[in-house]
Amino acid sequence: MTAIQQFFKTFFLTELLKGLALTGRYTFKRKFTVQFPEEKTPISPRFRGLHALRRYENGEERCIACKLCEAVCPALAITIESETRADNTRRTTRYDIDLTKCIFCGFCEESCPVDSIVETQILEYHGEKRGDLYFTKDMLLAVGDRYEKEVAAAKAADARYR
C-alpha cells in the first residue's frame, strides 16, 4: 500500500465508515436474542443435563456396580463403592457424582450396560455452595424416580440411533 492510499484511508476515515455501514445494515434486521427465563428454545433430544440413576419396574435399582462409568469418566467425577449380596450379585453402596468436576461428556451413559446412569433434559439447577453440587446415590435415584417417564421417552426416541 502506498503512502498516498494510506493517507486517504486515514484522512477520510474509510474504516470507520465501513464499520458504521455494517452496523446500520444489522440495526434493522430481525433480532435473534432469546430472553431466557421467559422464553425457552427447544432442547435437543440428545441434550446432556443433570444425571439420574434409574430403577427397574419392580423398584430395584439398575446399577450392577460394574464401575465402567467410573473408569471411563475423564474428569474423575464419579465415585462408586459396592458390596456383594447374598445372591452373589453386586450392588452399589455408594454412588457419588461431583458436578463441579463433571464435563457432561456422556461417556458414563454410553458405557453403562444396563442404562442405569442417564443424563436428563434438566438444565436448570444450581447450588449456593460447593457441596450442593455433590450428588449422592439417594439424590440421583430421587431424580431418576421423579423424571423416569421423560427419561424413558427420550431413550425410546433415541433408540434407533444407538
Swiss-Prot record:
InterPro entries named among the record's database cross-references: 4Fe4S_Fe-S-bd, 4Fe4S_Fe_S_CS, NADH_quinone_OxRdtase_chainI
Catalytic EC class: translocase
Pfam family name, one: Fer4_7
E.C. designation(s): 7.1.1.-
Signal peptide, first to last residue: none
Annotated Gene Ontology cellular component terms: plasma membrane
Reaction it catalyzes: a quinone + NADH + 5 H(+)(in) = a quinol + NAD(+) + 4 H(+)(out)
Location(s), subcellular: Cell inner membrane
Similarity field: Belongs to the complex I 23 kDa subunit family.
HAMAP family: NDH1_NuoI
Protein name stated in the entry: NADH-quinone oxidoreductase subunit I
Species per Swiss-Prot/TrEMBL record: Burkholderia pseudomallei (strain 668)
